[in-house]
Amino acid sequence: MTDILDEIIAHKRLEIEQQKAAISQELLINNCNEPMPRRSMRASLSASPSGIIAEFKRRSPSKGWIKENAQADIIPPAYEMAGASVLSILTDENFFGGNLKDIRAARPQVSLPILRKDFIIDEYQLYQACIVGADAVLLIAAALRNCLLYTSPSPRDRSVS
């Protein structure tokens, strides 16, 4: 892993520990038993002439702030009107300025499938994605070594791709 990826993953582990202390995984699982209808990323990309995955991101570690007060209920509909097939929403707060609330804000405003883009290292995050309405999650291979996802149930079991 790169130095920045190591730093992000270390921070993500602490963040997830704090989240688990506030909201148990059992509670997330119970609230994910009746997930909202999912939108197929594969079907959307296959049917699209562009195949564009548009990304909602406020900042990046390398570039700094892109648009600090970008609103997830306003920008994603513009991406859809411009022809995007899928919407990728960064939910990492510390390094990218995102939040799970961004998926909740965008979902009712668009008909596109939504990809939760984050550093997924624990099945807890899959249940979070299910609850907020993500249709898929991004898995970064370099971040998956020695993580808890290897023992997780299939994402299809929870209706998240």
Task: Give the residues covered by each predicted segment.
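Short, structured coil segments at secondary-structure junctions
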Residues: 110, 132-133
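Conserved N-terminal beta1-alpha1 strand-loop-helix module at the mouth
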Residues: 1-112
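Short beta-strand/loop segments at the ligand-binding rim of alpha/beta enzyme cores
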Residues: 109-116, 152
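"…together with the soluble PPM/PP2C metallo-phosphatase catalytic core" -> "…together
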Residues: 129
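Glycine-rich phosphate-binding active-site loops on the catalytic face of alpha/beta enzymes
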Residues: 134-144
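Conserved small/polar residues in nucleotide/adenosyl-binding loops
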Residues: 150-157
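Structural motif
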Residues: 90, 115-117, 140
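Active-site-adjacent beta->alpha loops and helix N-cap segments on the catalytic face
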Residues: 93-106, 122-126, 142-149
